[in-house]
């Protein structure tokens, strides 16, 4: 595995910690220590399965990125490629410019949205309770849900992107935005 993949995964873990810090949940040393340990465990679980390739990845996602790579990246978006929504195809086209394996980039994108989903869930709960323990507990519950870990990190699927947007939509609707 490329060292850049490990670095990007570490940056995503740091981003998760930053979101908790920005939410005011790391003021107590015990909470900060727990957050660091849980982030290490959550991202360790994801790291352990990053190399796995599903048939879906081999038969579709990798071929779509390869098509973008051979056809000029973003210019290839003029053609019908795959059956995913257009914003996701923009990410695949972007990945075609990188020398990092598209398997890892696809999975890292999903992991990024695992964090957004956990944060959005925490934001929604924050509308009903200010308890730092409950909010942080929900953040890590979402990050440790088996379906969340497996969907992006193992299967290279993008469900966290859609679910994160849906939860953020509920937060914004609740706030009348």
Regions picked out by a protein language model, each given a short descriptive name:
Residues 2-59, 111, 144-146, 150:
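Transmembrane signal-anchor helices characteristic of membrane glycosylation enzymes that use polyprenol
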Residues 2-4, 86, 100-119:
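Loop-to-helix entry region of an early transmembrane alpha helix in multi-pass inner-membrane enzymes
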Residues 8-13, 114, 158-167:
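Hydrophobic core segments of transmembrane alpha-helices in multi-pass, intramembrane catalytic enzymes
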Residues 15, 19, 108-129, 168:
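Transmembrane-helix motifs of polytopic, lipid-linked glycan transferases
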Residues 22-26, 120-136, 171-176:
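Transmembrane alpha-helical segments of multipass membrane enzymes and assembly factors
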Residues 30-38, 101-109, 131-138:
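Membrane-interface starts of transmembrane alpha-helices
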Residues 60-69, 74-105:
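Short hydrophobic/aromatic helix or loop-helix immediately within or flanking a transmembrane segment
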Residues 135-173:
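Membrane-embedded helix bundles of polyisoprenyl
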